[in-house]
Structures are given as structure tokens and as C-alpha cells.
């Protein structure tokens, strides 16, 4: 798993709702560092769980993405959040 591969997965599967780390469906649920921290989603494990199982308006990606792809996208999201998107 690596962030570069995660970027490709993100662009293909996540960017429609989370372009540039935003939250197009729920503006309070962005992928910005402060929002990840406030929502307890600021670890690889927490993001992996969210992507795998979904929650609210976000669909589950279990079965659509491999475990390695989900791990990679989590690394990508954290890397981009640290850099301010």
C-alpha cells in the first residue's frame, strides 16, 4: 500500500464527492486535517474502517476495492490532509 497508488484509487472512486478534500454532500464532513481530527478519522485505521464499511451518505467500498487499495487511499488522504490538499 502506498499513497501514490492511493491517489489513483481516490481519483477514480472518491473524487466525485471529495474533490480537493471537500465534502460535496455534507460540507461538514471534509477530508481536511481539522475535520478528520474532529470526526476521529485522523488515523489510517479509522479511514480504512470508514471506506470499508461506509457511514451515512458514504457507501461502503468493501467488495468494490481490495484491502490494499483501501489502505493506499487512506495513506493518500492523510498525506494530502497533512499538506492542506
Curated annotation (Swiss-Prot):
Pfam families: Cytochrome_CBB3
UniProt entry keywords in alphabetical sequence: Electron transport, Heme, Iron, Metal-binding, Photosynthesis, Thylakoid, Transport
Any one GO molecular-function label of the UniProt entry: electron transfer activity
SUPFAM superfamilies assigned: Cytochrome c
GO cellular component: plasma membrane-derived thylakoid lumen
Record PTM: Binds 1 heme c group covalently per subunit.
Gene Ontology terms describing biological process: photosynthesis
Residues that hold heme c according to the record: 14, 17-18, 58
Top-rank lineage group of the source organism: Bacteria
Localization annotation: Cellular thylakoid lumen
Subunit architecture: Monomer.
Protein function: Functions as an electron carrier between membrane-bound cytochrome b6-f and photosystem I in oxygenic photosynthesis.
Homology family: Belongs to the cytochrome c family. PetJ subfamily.
HAMAP family documented for this protein: Cytc_PetJ
Protein name (record): Cytochrome c6
Gene name of the record: petJ
Amino acid at each position: 500500500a502506498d499513497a501514490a497508488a492511493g491517489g489513483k484509487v481516490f481519483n477514480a472512486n472518491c473524487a466525485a464527492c471529495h474533490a480537493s478534500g471537500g465534502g460535496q454532500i455534507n460540507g461538514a464532513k471534509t477530508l481536511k486535517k481539522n475535520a478528520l481530527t474532529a470526526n476521529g478519522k485522523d488515523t489510517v485505521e479509522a479511514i480504512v474502517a470508514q471506506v470499508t464499511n461506509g457511514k451515512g451518505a458514504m457507501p461502503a467500498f468493501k467488495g468494490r476495492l481490495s484491502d490494499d487499495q483501501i489502505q493506499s487511499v487512506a495513506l493518500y488522504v492523510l498525506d494530502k490532509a497533512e499538506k492542506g490538499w
